[in-house]
Amino acid sequence: VIAGRIANRLNLGGTNCTVDAACASSLSAMKMAISDLLEYRADMMIAGGVDADNSPMMYMCFSKTPAFTSGENPRPFDQDSGGVMIGEGLGMVVLKRLEDAQRDGDRVYALIKGIGASSDGKFKSIYAPRSSGQAKALKRAYEDANVEPLSIGLLEAHGTGTDAGDLAEFEGLKEIFNSDKAKNSDYPNYQHIALGSIKSQIGH
């Protein structure tokens, strides 16, 4: 009842629910919130993610997982990367339609032009990422935003820092940015798109 408790305390009358999609939970929650806004089922939505491993047993279980780094500095997409680092915390955003935010005099920090999601389906295991699924989510996001992928100059990645995760994500990026269309592109950023992962520095 966590989401319901927040709605109760803040006197919010829209949809409230908890979304569990592992590493994609906050993005999935945002996608649901955006849908409610665009379809005028709500005028404001609060969405985000939280991770709090409040049990010693959780830390013990995670410590046995080979995907987790033994060091302090995760290095996604680096040959010296040792794996993923877990972090605890909470991040939330308040979402409104742009015209409503401007009308209300709100401070607008960012504009979401589009969003995309996908699932890997049946693959090697439920924990193994699939590059085609990554590419599908990217493609849907760019199409939803009506943005040409090659026009961007910075890409924020998931960046787990694991061999399997980084490889699948990078292969998905190559599928989008290294197509025949990309090779014939006139966009100035085609040869240089910065790749970062703030999430890996905070913790997954």
Where are the predicted features?
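Condensing-enzyme catalytic core of the thiolase-fold
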Residues: 1-204
